[in-house]
């Protein structure tokens, strides 16, 4: 990298930062009509490496860039497994990955989707109402698991995965898009065997080339270009302790820090 690139934005990823990460998603300043999505901790002022970065034209807003980055996870996992997605779908968790998965499924044409969440915040209710109108969909919030054919697991929590295994019917599918980090797992392999369950991992890096991931990202940016996304993304200006303050309470699906450059 010949010329130093400043970092203009970083995105908060609660799933990783809860376990000690200081952030890893940065968006560079504009140079020669281009931006880069880079590996970057919060408060880093310059891009250290372009390894695993995505280059894209400066024609997309920050809300689109943020959603599209998280939407890589469901896209790269679900695209070649659509035969395993049944109409009875539940998404467990509505954080960064869960909400991105919801948007991706709606864009694929799935209309009836249940959402399992514990805390039904106003921003969640408002978003579901808006998306139901926009997509003519039937998105519903549930607080307990029942029987579905397709489970999108976006929490990474062992007890949720265990409950899915206990409730799932034969020949159904689970997509593990959340990252299990707890270290204690409660799944009985005999249940998987007896019910002939399909389980798919959803890690966005392993088994996928940089070219494939970059292509997915560009496709998503184009897909989302005309979407109204401002209500789903909070952008905060840089100030002391802003990251810690934002992490204290979740106020929207996506949270972004903007730096003075």
Predicted regions located by residue number:
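Short, acidic/turn-prone active-site loops that include or flank metal/cofactor-
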Residues: 42-43, 59-61, 118-121, 178-182, ...
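Phosphate-binding loop/pocket of nucleotide- and phosphate-handling active sites
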Residues: 258-261
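Glycine-rich cofactor phosphate-binding loops and adjacent beta1-alpha1 units
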Residues: 125, 129-198
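Glycine-rich beta-strand-centered segment in the early N-terminal region that forms part
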Residues: 1-44
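Mid-domain Rossmann-like dinucleotide-binding core that forms the NAD(H)/NADP(H) cofactor-binding site
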Residues: 64-145
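Glycine- and other small-residue-rich loops at beta-strand/loop junctions that grip anionic moieties
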Residues: 90, 94, 116, 152-154, ...
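C-terminal substrate-binding/catalytic core of Rossmann-like NAD(P)-dependent dehydrogenases/reductases
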Residues: 185-233, 242
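NAD(P)H dinucleotide-binding glycine-rich loop of Rossmann-like/cofactor-binding domains
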Residues: 27-92
